[in-house]
Amino acid sequence: MEGRLFLIGVTMGLYTWKSRSLKKNGGLDSPLRRGLWHGLFCSLAASAAALVLSVSMEKHTRFVFVGPNAFAASEFYPSIIAAIVGFVYGFFRGRAEPENKRGYFLLEDSEWAETVFSAVLLAATIMYFIVQAFKIPSGSMENTLLIGDHLFVNKFIYGLRIPFTGKRVFNFRGVKRGDIMVFSFPDQDPRDVHCGSVQYHRDFIKRVIGLPGDKIEVRAGQLYINDVPIKNEPYAHFSDGELRQPESVRAFDLSPKKYQELWQNHELDGILQDVQRDFFGPVVVPPNSYFMMGDNRDRSCDSRYWGPVPLKDVRGKAWFIYWPPARMGTVH
């Protein structure tokens, strides 16, 4: 969301700058030019509103549009339609402006664009660098986080992200085992299906189980870290009473090297399906990456299925539940 807000803010800023230049040079004196420029503003405003609304109301199923860096179709098409409608409306409204109100629409447009530029850039900066609100959409973190919980995520604790680089500066502390983190789904191919649907570009929230270099394995539902069984995890929740798959079909005769390779390349669940929920690994967490699991171990689509999470994809650390009031408090 913050990336979209930043784009909207920059666009409105450019519109404000160009409007001042055109008015100063008399470039908007004719009715036709005023209509075109007012149409452009209405087009930008309508497409921005449609984009924000579509992202806010986006459902779990996403329809991917063209390439891996493109907008989802659920965001792209409403924005295009809104832009066209906004331009047509603005063009005829601006062109029909009476002589006694010449420039009224353009002045109003510039003021609105400047306001949006300032407000949106401020909001995008806060969301990108400092804190952002999220809503829990599934039960994968029960009973720590419940469906419908609203929480703030600390975006700077692991360092301030440098836009478009994947790098961080001013690291306040490193990632620790047990941290609950929000991250972007690590597989960068928008066509890949994981856990039954396309997960590309979605935000996930899970708990850090494995740090770089850790050996992770699950045997009959029991988690092992560096060959040590992890007992009495206070946050782990198991909702099924039986193992989903027998160990005899666990690895489909995959060599340890091939198993690790498939896991790191986010391809393991395409071969093993649901086997790895109760029988997984062993794998070694690669450098600058983390092994993530949901607290609801039997109902979580996590690193057992789609691989490690690189630090560059980490959005921040879950910090504080602010809604509903009965569950208000810090996240552990």
Where are these regions (language model features)?
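Aromatic-capped interface at the extracytoplasmic side
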Residues: M127-G139
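N-terminal Sec-pathway targeting helices
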Residues: E108-V116
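Hydrophobic membrane-insertion alpha-helices, especially the h-region
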Residues: T115-F129
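Conserved active-site regions of diverse hydrolases
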Residues: R93
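Soluble "head" domains of membrane/secretory-pathway proteins
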Residues: M1-A49, L53, T61, G67, ...
